[in-house]
């Protein structure tokens, strides 16, 4: 029987790159709240004592970049100068300018339905049936670990935790099915006065055990909890952070391909983001319909052109109908032009800051996670 291991990682909301993502999306949300048709490309850089917010925006809205930045950092938990990064004292630099009119003329149209793609590019969507949310298990549980770290930090269960943390989970598979967890890595920033023994016990009992299913843990499972022995210096003091540097964490943990475009800070006219959401919606509905156990869809676009330049689907030998039939069903039931997919998923609204930590996919409540097309797909496929 074929055996293999697969690993995915995640990072907490206090990781420097995720601070940057959340600030970029907080700015985007604030603008969309006033101007749903705004064009926004917001990038953020964080380092010890400073935040630089830049990019290109076309909007009728006015937002307070400094206040949005400080509020976001405060909510994450960087509120003391002894952390090296403090929401109330860090410098906030604003370098936002206007979007190029050359891009605008290629995107905007008299007929909104003919709105062109904001850039060229290729995007992937993926789903499989190894978890209830139709996501790969390694990234699902890697996210769950750092999400739990944040919860027990904020509610005071483990008061010595600090915001920066990373997780990594290695699953063992046999003939494509999960048979256990081979290794778990969890590194968390902490106060200087906590002992390694107390930290290991606290992390194991309040983070790892409540999150990971007991049936997948066994005597051979390996645990690496703060394996360097010390993680006091973290956040933007330890490393600079930049928007868009956690694209695999944001998506499928490496189990699906990635077109290379980041999500955070981009309004829905940017197909890097909106078409990746639509592709997830398509793949999830195909799997939910029982048309495949695994599904990866690729879409591609040309700048200024509404129709996708290509659609392709891979089901890895698990499809119940041909991939040609699936593509026909996708064209019939899903709108993949930029204006149409924005309307289909109701994307022109302030929903993005909440996506910017713990993954954009596999979290109920987002429109691209709905499986409302599954029954129609199944019926039209003749199953």
UniProtKB/Swiss-Prot annotation:
Pathway: Amino-acid biosynthesis; S-adenosyl-L-methionine biosynthesis; S-adenosyl-L-methionine from L-methionine: step 1/1. PROSITE patterns: ADOMET_SYNTHASE_1, ADOMET_SYNTHASE_2. It is found in: Cytoplasm. Mg(2+) binds at residue 17. Signal peptide: none annotated. L-methionine binds at residues 56, 99, 239, 270. Its cofactor is Mg(2+); K(+). It catalyses: L-methionine + ATP + H2O = S-adenosyl-L-methionine + phosphate + diphosphate. Keywords: ATP-binding, Cytoplasm, Magnesium, Metal-binding, Nucleotide-binding, One-carbon metabolism, Potassium, Transferase. Transmembrane segments: none annotated. Binds 2 divalent ions per subunit. Binds 1 potassium ion per subunit. InterPro entries: ADOMET_SYNTHASE_CS, S-AdoMet_synt_C, S-AdoMet_synt_central, S-AdoMet_synt_N, S-AdoMet_synthetase, S-AdoMet_synthetase_sfam. One of its GO terms (biological process) is one-carbon metabolic process. It is an enzyme of class 2 (transferase). Homotetramer; dimer of dimers. Catalyzes the formation of S-adenosylmethionine (AdoMet) from methionine and ATP. The overall synthetic reaction is composed of two sequential steps, AdoMet formation and the subsequent tripolyphosphate hydrolysis which occurs prior to release of AdoMet from the enzyme. This is S-adenosylmethionine synthase. The lineage of its organism: Bacteria, Pseudomonadati, Pseudomonadota, Gammaproteobacteria, Alteromonadales. The gene is metK.
